Amino acid sequence: SEGSPENRICTNNCAGYKGCNYNCDTNIASYKSVCEGEFDPKCLR
């Protein structure tokens, strides 16, 4: 797992998709970052 303690990664509904773990912070940039550069609507669940 790549994730600094300062970036808490929350595994949520996206867990089954493409390793789509999203950051606890609701910043779109963070979503894009953890979603492997792909901004996917599933990441917003």
Swiss-Prot record:
Subcellular location: Secreted
Keyword entries, A-Z: Disulfide bond, Protease inhibitor, Secreted, Serine protease inhibitor
Disulfide bonds: 10-24, 14-35, 20-43
Transmembrane residue ranges: none
Keyword Secreted: yes
Function per UniProt: Inhibits trypsin strongly and chymotrypsin temporarily.
Recorded family membership: Belongs to the protease inhibitor I20 (potato type II proteinase inhibitor) family.
Identification of the protein by name: Proteinase inhibitor IIA
Native species: Solanum tuberosum
